[in-house]
Amino acid sequence: MVGCDSIPHGSGKREETVAVAASKAPPPRGVTVLLVDDQPIIGEAVRRMLSGEEGISFHYCKDASAALAKAAEVQPTVILQDLVMPEIDGLTLVRHFRADERFRDVPIIVLSTKEEPAVKAEAFAIGANDYIVKLPDRLELIARVRYHSRGYVALMERNEAFTALEASRQVLANDLATAADYVRSLLPPPQERGGV
């Protein structure tokens, strides 16, 4: 992929319904960071900050136009991204991530040199979850990455549990309908009442 690097740190219906629920991708475990920034020196600096941290894998994408494809590949639990990039500006990229069903809920932390309150407010208004001025302290960056990832993983686990519960409810409803049909088939046909 151009401009992106990874640094890995019963009834037939019943089986069908359960298979559909089981085919959903499980929620991500651990912390997977995707950094989108056109400056390789920033990519290297962030990689060094996160290296050695247990449970964190880091992926870097230099080309903002390849960011969605890279995100689909690595399934990040948090996205760090710059605002000023040549192909696609950072605010537009936030909009692209939020418009894509796959990444709608993935936390986005803007990592930028811009400190103006109006820029920060706009980033939050279009869907960024956090805003850090480059380059933050290592401990702060790790804390924010872990915090946002924890929230995202909890959301995915909740959604997975809800999907499984809904699939189970549907299986029970189908089983009840099948049982009701069977019981009705055992009953004698209704008698017509005639006049006496």
Predicted regions and their residues:
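… and, occasionally, acidic/histidine-rich disordered N-termini of signaling adaptors
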Residues: 164-196
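Active-site beta3 strand of CheY-like receiver
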Residues: 74-80
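Active-site residues of response regulator receiver
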Residues: 37, 82, 112
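C-terminal output helix
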Residues: 118, 135-145, 149
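Two-component/phosphorelay signaling modules centered on CheY-like receiver
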Residues: 31, 40-59
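The feature encodes the CheY-like receiver
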Residues: 42, 77, 86-87, 95, ...
